[in-house]
Amino acid sequence: MQTVAKSWSEPYTDLVLQPSTIRMLLGVLLLLLGTGVYLLDRSWQQLAIADLIPLTVTLPPLFGVLGGNLPSFAHVSAFALLTAALLDGGRRLNPIICLGWLSVDVAFELGQHPKLAASIANAVPAWFRDVPILDKTPNYFLSGTFDLLDIAFATLGALTAYLVIANTQAQGVCHEDRSL
């Protein structure tokens, strides 16, 4: 005998997302958000792929004031969540993952500081010039703008990622702790 669901949501009550799936989905969504800022709010000429996509479309800023710093938040939190989803390393590794991605973002932000940018751009290996996208590396440092708010947003992104990771573990939906 076939049973009939009592409500539209009843068939889905057994659906449980694993922590790695939650982290992966949120990470991908945050990556899309950060990418969306670059594609929708920034000039195409600023993009590393500008030479590959010959467009001259100009749109009004969709993300407004937040558009300047939102990628720092989105990318740090996305990469931390994606890394935590792939490694599933336990409570001891998760803060290291978040701090690691924060450190990468802060290093690139500091590299745009006027006192450091020229030195770093000159230190880029010569072979980068022959690799699409990598050939833009010196311009990233020379044309970029150092912004303390980017560091603040990146810090908020790392903290947010850590809270998401810790929360999925605290709710008992994570496998046993595989500490270092």
Q: What do these predicted regions represent?
A:
Residues M1-L180:
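Bulky hydrophobic segments
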